[in-house]
């Protein structure tokens, strides 16, 4: 019992520090900017501009908005947009393309906090967009070509608050702050549990055994990768933060592995996005296949860049 307590207490302290002093302020600023641009109609104009360009990749106007959400809010934010696409009659084939794109792109709730640890965020977002487009193309034109392309008449407009005066701006910022607080607080349990489990596995020698069994993989990559694919990007963030603080992970390594570690294609991410609706859940296979292609491209580009 004493051993468990000595593991849990430092894990809890690290989780609180990461959530409240790194994740929360970054998400408050990013969400406030995102919601203000949305309320001022900037995002509406951007979506209208990009939609004709992205159509050949199998993406609709709402899918474009989902790409903005995953890049600047969090991996879970596009779930609401996918649900809206499903309800408004988007075809299964277009749903698969949008789902694949989201799974392959860098998630804001991991990318921006990792910027404080040396991650070059702008290149990550640029490469992420290219990977997302490839993922959507593979899902739409190859993996999902057998899916239905039949669509209803789509309403591509976005329903959101409008900030027409100073009070409206303050209201938007307050709502964004509350949303950021919910994201940060909801991350604490997963961070505590993941840090506790990983510390216990490390002390039991399981991580070292896995590292020895995979000699062709950088030993410093094994722990973040296992954590990321089993427990999600937020849990991975906690592990990477700990490794960076103890000097076991450099900024160069973090940038080289960005394509492998920063995306929602993990068990929690797929589960959350599949919950958007029954049709979205049915197209997970072509979406995952497309996402794998996009992530492979991102991983290769980041390795070349570093």
Q: What residue spans do the PLM features occupy?
A:
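Juxtamembrane inter-helical linkers in multi-pass membrane proteins
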Residues: 48-63, 150-169, 217-218
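Intrinsically disordered, low-complexity non-transmembrane regions of multi-pass membrane transporters
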Residues: 1-6, 10, 144-178
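Hydrophobic mid-bilayer segments of alpha-helices in multi-pass membrane transport proteins
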Residues: 23-32, 127-136, 151-159, 187-196
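Transmembrane helical segments that form the transport core of multi-pass membrane transport proteins
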Residues: 30, 34-54, 169-243
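N-terminal signal-anchor module of multipass membrane proteins
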Residues: 1-45, 303
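A loop-to-helix transmembrane entry motif
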Residues: 63-71, 220-230, 255
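C-terminal transmembrane helix pair
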Residues: 78-141, 238-306
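Membrane helical hairpin/interfacial module
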Residues: 38-47, 55-82
């Amino acid at each position: 019992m004493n051993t468990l307590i000595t593991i849990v207490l430092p894990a809890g302290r690290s989780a609180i520090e990461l959530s409240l002093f790194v994740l929360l302020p970054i998400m408050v600023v990013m969400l406030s900017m995102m919601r203000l641009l949305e309320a001022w109609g900037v995002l509406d104009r951007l979506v209208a501009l990009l939609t004709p360009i992205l159509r050949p990749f199998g993406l609709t106007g709402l899918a474009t908005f989902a790409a903005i959400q995953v890049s600047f809010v969090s991996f879970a934010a596009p779930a609401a947009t996918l649900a809206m696409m499903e309800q408004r009659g988007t075809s299964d084939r277009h749903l698969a393309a949008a789902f694949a794109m989201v799974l392959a792109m860098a998630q804001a709730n991991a990318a921006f906090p990792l910027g404080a640890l040396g991650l070059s965020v702008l290149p990550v977002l640029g490469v992420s967009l290219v990977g997302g487009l490839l993922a959507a193309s593979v899902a739409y034109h190859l993996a999902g070509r057998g899916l239905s392309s039949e669509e209803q008449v789509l309403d591509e407009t976005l329903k959101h608050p409008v900030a027409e005066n100073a009070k409206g701006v303050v209201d938007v910022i307050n709502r964004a702050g509350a949303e950021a607080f919910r994201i940060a607080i909801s991350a604490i349990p997963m961070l505590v549990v993941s840090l506790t489990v990983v510390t216990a596995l490390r002390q039991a020698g399981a991580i070292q055994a896995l590292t020895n069994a995979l000699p062709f993989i950088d030993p410093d990559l094994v722990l973040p990768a296992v954590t990321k694919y089993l427990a999600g990007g937020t849990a991975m963030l906690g592990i990477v933060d700990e490794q960076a603080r103890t000097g076991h992970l450099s900024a160069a390594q973090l940038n080289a592995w960005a394509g492998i570690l920063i995306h929602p294609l993990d068990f929690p991410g797929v589960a959350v996005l599949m919950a958007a609706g029954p049709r979205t859940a049915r197209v997970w296979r072509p979406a995952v296949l497309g996402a794998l292609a996009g992530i492979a491209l991102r991983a290769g580009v980041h390795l070349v860049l570093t």
